[in-house]
Amino acid sequence: MRRESIPAPLRLSLSGPTAVHDAVVAASTFAERAGLAGASASRLAIVVEELAMNLYDHGGLGADDAFDLELSSSRAEVRLVLIAPGPEFDPRQSISREFSSSRGGGAGLDLVRTWSRLLEHDYVEGRNRVALALPIATASGTAD
């Protein structure tokens, strides 16, 4: 499937009880506007959901704290930038897992690492900034 257009970048600041849901809806809408195939659209939504959920579950983000989500795309990849307050978290470092049978014990971050490439990580003034690239799948389901 050849994508005909590249949508304008999307930048959102999200907070409150619907923030994770709103982030997933925004990612899905962005994927649709970008003309992403099913696999790429699904992966983008899952990566956004996992990262946003981890902010609340493990990153100390409170209900009133806001995080920023930026999405942009090229012909070959979608770039995702997530900026959030909290303790420093460098996704390049190995994570000690406390496995939980009910939650999957780190499976979400494993998906994020499998489906994306870390472009950069910064920690400045109490805020993490993580930039990832997700390759866009072709019609056959493989990344370009």
Regions found by a protein language model. Name each.
Residues 20, 24-27, 112:
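Heptad-repeat coiled-coil signal-transmission/dimerization helices
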Residues 9-22:
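STAS-typified acidic loop motif
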Residues 25-49, 101-102:
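Conserved short strand/loop->alpha-helix "switch" segment adjacent to the catalytic nucleotide/phosphoryl-transfer site
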Residues 1-11, 56-144:
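Conserved beta-strand-loop-beta-strand hairpin that lines the nucleotide-binding pocket
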Residues 26-30, 54, 118:
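Solvent-exposed, charged/polar functional surfaces in cytosolic regulatory/catalytic domains
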Residues 49, 53, 57:
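Short alpha-helix lining the ATP-binding pocket of the histidine-kinase-like ATPase
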